[in-house]
Swiss-Prot record:
Glycosylation sites: N100, N193, N230, N626
UniProt cross-references to InterPro entries, sorted A to Z: Di-copper_centre_dom_sf (IPR008922), Hemocyanin/hexamerin (IPR013788), Hemocyanin/hexamerin_mid_dom (IPR000896), Hemocyanin_C (IPR005203), Hemocyanin_C_sf (IPR037020), Hemocyanin_N (IPR005204), Hemocyanin_N_sf (IPR036697), Ig_E-set (IPR014756)
Region (Disordered): 7-32
Subunit structure of this chain's protein: Hexamer.
Pfam families: Hemocyanin_C, Hemocyanin_M, Hemocyanin_N
SUPFAM superfamilies linked: Di-copper centre-containing domain, E set domains, Hemocyanin, N-terminal domain
Protein's name according to its UniProt entry: Pseudohemocyanin-1
Length: 684
C-alpha cells in the first residue's frame, strides 16, 4: 500500500507531505514512490493491476482532462485516445515487434504522451490508463522507452525484462514445467538448457548468445538510442550512428573471441546470393502460445513477401559501397555530404540503420532493419504456415540466432571499408607529450567459470486479480552464466611534466592468435579489439601506479536487481525503514560486468592487452568528465562524453605498427585467459 497516500482517496488526488523522503526528482515526488508505481505496472503484466491505489486511479483518470501542462497542449493524448476510441490499436495478447512499422507507430504514440507529462500524477495516470487499453508488449516497449528518456524518472530503475516478459528468454519446456507446478500448487526451480545439442558446433557458444544479461544490454541500448528518435521527443541524441556502429562492432568482436575460446572458425559474413548455412530452432514461445519460427540449415535466401526482394538488399548495399568509395553521401536535395572525416562514421551508421537523421532514407533504404526482417522470415518467406516474427525481429531475442552475427559481420565489413578510407593517425596526433607507460600487468587471475543464476517466472504465470504480491508462489528458472574471477589492471605511468595532467586511459584486448594458431598482424588485431575500459585519471608529476578493478569498468554494468528485490526496496523506503539507493543500476546500457573478458579455455587463450593514455583535456567535453562516466559509457541523455572516435586510437588502419611501438604513451603485453570447466551450482 502507499503509505504516503493513506489520507487521500487516490495517491495523486491532492498534495501530500513527502517529509522523510529525498526530493530527488523535478516534481518533488520521491523516487521510492515512482519505483513502487513502475514495479506494480509491470508486475503481472498480462493481468489487471494488483495494486489498489493504482487500480482506483485507473478507474478515475481521464487523459483528456490532464493536458493543461503539456507542451503540445494535448495533441499526443488526443491522437492516442482517438486510436482507442476507433479500436485501431493492436489487440491484447498478440505479438509486437518494433520492426513492424504499424505496431511501432502505436508504441510511439504512448511514448509521446508519457514524455509530454510534466509531473508524476499526470505521467502515472496516463501509464495506468493505457495499460489496460494497449497490447501488453507494445506497452512495455513504450513504457521502458519513456522511463529511460523522461526527466521525471531519471532515478527509476527498470526491472530486468527477462522477469517482466519471461517467455522471450525462457525455453518452452521450462515454461511448461512452470505451468504444471503452478497448477498443482507446488513451488519449483527448473534448470534450463541452452538451445541445440552437441551435434551442432554452434551449441558450444550458446552461453554467449543466450545470456539473458547480454540480451538485456542489447535491448537497453536500443531503448537508449532508438533508430526512430528525433528532437521532437525532447532532445537530439549525439553520435547516434557512431554508437550504432560501435555497439554492434563490439558484439561481433566479442562473439569472435568466444569462438576462438571454443576452437570454432571465425564468422562467415552474410552474402545475399549464397546459402545461409546455420539453421536455428529457438525453442521459445510467445505468451499467447504461438511458437517462434525456426529455420533449417543450408537454405537459399529468398525474397520475402511484403518485406523485400533479395535484389533490393543488394541495391542498398551497393549504394552504400559507392558512397564509401566516393567519400560522400547524397542528401535529399542532391547535395554531397562528405564522410571522409571523423564524423563520417556517424552519418554512415544513420544510413545503415535507417535512422531519422539519415540524409536520404528513400535512396539508401534500411539495410539493417530490413536485413533482420529478411533473415527472420527465411523459414517461411511466403507466410504459408505462420506470420509471427522470428527471434531476429525482437531485440530481446535476436542475439540467440547465429544469423544475427553473420548479418552484423557483413555490416561491420562496410564500416571497416569506410574507416580504412580515412587517413591513419600521425605520430603527432597519437603522442601525449611527457607521458610514458612503464609497465602493464594484471593483478589476479584471468579465469572464467560458470555459475547458476536464478530468475523469477512469476510474470509468466496467471493469477486471480485479488492475489497479493506476497502471496505469489516461487517459481523460477535456473541457467548457467559465464563469470570471471576478480582481477585488476595495473598500469605504471610516468608523467614527466611539471604539473598534473588529466589522462584518458583506454584499455583494449584482441586475440593474439586466430583459431588456427596464426598470430594476428597488428592491423588485423586492432580491428578485432574488444574494449575493456575507458576512464579519466589525473596523473601527478613523476611515477603513477594506476589500479583499476574489473568491476569498475565503464564498459560494463552490474546485474539489475530482480523485480522482487526492487519491490522490497521500494516498499522499505516508503515505510521509512531504509533509504532507496539504486544509483548504480540506473544506466543499464553496458555489458554485464561478468562478461568483461572472453571465456578462454583450459590451455589458456592468448590476448594482446593494449593500453593507450591520451590527453584527457583534449578528449573531454565536460570539465567533470572523470566523475561522470562510471555508469554511462555510451553517454547519457544524448550526450557522449569523449570527443574521440569510438575505438580510438585503434579505429583507423595502421600501415606500420612500429609507429605504435615507438609512442611512449602506448603500451602492450600478452596475457592468457583460462577456463577450467568450473561450474558453481548455487541452487541444488
Amino acid at each position: 500500500s502507499l503509505v504516503v497516500a493513506a489520507a487521500a482517496a487516490s495517491p495523486y488526488s491532492g498534495s501530500h507531505d513527502f517529509s522523510g523522503f529525498q526530493r530527488d526528482e523535478p516534481d518533488g515526488v520521491p523516487t521510492a514512490q515512482k519505483q513502487h508505481d513502475i514495479n506494480f505496472l509491470l508486475h503481472k503484466l498480462y493481468e489487471p493491476l494488483h495494486e489498489a491505489n493504482l487500480k482506483a486511479l485507473e478507474d478515475s483518470f481521464d487523459p483528456l482532462t490532464h493536458t493543461a501542462n503539456m507542451p503540445d497542449a494535448g495533441v499526443a493524448v488526443n491522437k492516442l485516445m482517438q486510436e482507442v476510441k476507433t479500436q485501431h490499436l493492436e489487440e491484447r495478447h498478440h505479438w509486437f515487434s518494433v520492426f513492424n512499422a504499424t505496431q511501432r507507430e502505436e508504441a510511439l504514440l504512448l511514448v509521446k504522451v508519457l514524455l509530454q507529462c510534466q509531473d508524476w500524477p499526470t505521467a502515472i495516470g496516463n501509464a495506468v490508463y493505457f495499460r489496460k487499453m494497449m497490447n501488453e508488449e507494445t506497452y512495455v516497449y513504450a513504457l521502458y522507452t519513456a522511463i529511460k528518456h523522461s526527466p521525471l524518472t531519471k532515478h527509476v530503475v527498470l526491472p530486468p525484462l527477462y522477469e517482466i516478459m519471461p517467455h522471450f528468454f525462457t525455453s518452452s519446456e521450462v515454461i511448461q514445467q512452470a505451468y504444471r507446478a503452478k497448477m498443482i500448487g507446488q513451488p519449483g526451480k527448473f534448470n534450463m538448457n541452452f538451445t541445440g545439442t552437441q551435434n551442432n558446433p554452434e551449441h558450444k557458444i550458446a552461453y554467449f548468445g543466450e545470456d539473458i544479461g547480454l540480451s538485456t544490454h542489447y535491448i537497453n541500448w536500443h531503448i537508449e538510442y532508438p533508430f526512430w528518435w528525433n528532437e521532437t521527443f525532447g532532445y537530439q541524441i549525439e553520435r547516434r550512428g557512431e554508437n550504432y556502429f560501435w555497439v554492434h562492432h563490439q558484439l561481433v568482436n566479442r562473439f569472435e573471441a568466444e569462438r576462438i575460446s571454443n576452437h570454432l572458425q571465425k564468422i562467415e559474413k552474410l552474402h545475399w546470393e549464397r546459402n545461409l548455412h546455420e539453421g536455428f530452432d529457438p525453442h521459445t514461445s510467445y505468451k499467447n502460445g504461438e511458437h517462434f519460427p525456426f529455420r533449417h540449415d543450408d537454405i537459399h535466401i529468398e525474397d520475402v513477401d511484403k518485406v523485400a526482394e533479395v535484389r533490393d538488399m543488394i541495391v542498398m548495399e551497393n549504394r552504400i559501397r559507392d558512397a564509401i568509395a566516393h567519400g560522400y553521401v547524397i542528401d535529399k536535395e542532391g547535395n554531397k555530404v562528405d564522410i571522409n572525416n571523423e564524423h563520417g562514421i556517424d552519418i554512415l551508421g544513420e544510413i545503415i540503420e535507417s535512422c531519422v537523421y539519415n540524409p536520404y532514407n528513400e535512396y539508401y533504404g534500411s539495410l539493417h532493419n530490413m536485413g533482420h526482417m529478411m533473415l527472420g522470415h527465411q523459414g517461411d518467406p511466403h507466410a504459408k504456415y505462420y506470420d509471427t516474427p522470428s527471434v531476429l525481429e525482437h531485440y530481446e531475442t535476436t542475439l540467440r540466432d547465429p544469423a544475427f552475427y553473420k548479418l552484423h559481420k557483413y555490416i561491420d565489413d562496410l564500416f571497416r571499408k569506410h574507416k580504412d578510407h580515412l587517413k591513419p593517425y600521425s605520430r603527432k596526433e597519437l603522442l601525449f607529450p611527457g607521458i610514458a607507460i612503464n609497465n602493464i600487468h594484471i593483478d589476479g587471475p584471468l579465469e572464467t567459470y560458470f555459475e547458476d543464476y536464478e530468475y523469477s517466472l512469476m510474470n509468466a504465470m496467471d493469477d486471480k486479480e485479488e492475489m497479493k504480491w506476497e502471496d505469489n508462489m516461487e517459481i523460477s528458472a535456473i541457467i548457467p552464466r559465464l563469470r570471471h574471477k576478480d582481477f585488476s589492471f595495473k598500469v605504471n605511468i610516468m608523467n614527466n611534466n611539471d604539473e598534473n595532467k588529466l589522462a584518458t586511459i583506454r584499455i583494449f584486448a584482441w586475440p593474439h592468435r586466430d583459431v588456427n594458431g596464426v598470430i594476428m598482424p597488428f592491423n588485423e588485431g586492432r580491428w578485432h579489439a574488444i574494449e575493456l575500459d575507458k576512464f579519466w585519471k589525473y596523473l601527478a608529476p613523476g611515477e603513477n601506479e594506476v589500479t583499476r578493478k574489473c568491476d569498475e569498468s565503464s564498459v560494463t554494468v552490474p546485474d539489475v536487481p530482480s523485480l522482487k528485490s526492487l519491490h522490497e526496496q521500494a516498499e522499505a523506503a516508503i515505510a521509512g525503514i531504509s533509504e532507496l539507493n539504486l544509483e548504480e543500476f540506473v544506466s543499464a546500457t553496458g555489458l554485464p560486468n561478468r562478461l568483461l573478458i572472453p571465456k578462454g579455455n583450459a590451455a589458456g587463450v592468448e590476448f594482446k592487452l593494449v593500453v593507450a593514455v591520451t590527453d584527457g583535456e583534449a578528449d573531454s567535453v565536460n570539465d567533470e568528465i572523470n566523475l561522470t562516466t562510471k555508469f554511462h559509457h555510451y553517454g547519457h541523455h544524448g550526450v557522449y562524453l569523449d570527443k574521440k572516435s569510438h575505438g580510438y586510437p585503434l579505429d583507423r588502419r595502421v600501415p606500420d605498427e612500429r609507429l605504435f611501438h615507438e609512442i611512449p604513451n602506448f603500451g602492450e603485453t600478452i596475457v592468457k585467459v583460462f577456463n577450467h570447466n568450473e561450474h558453481v551450482h548455487r541452487h541444488e
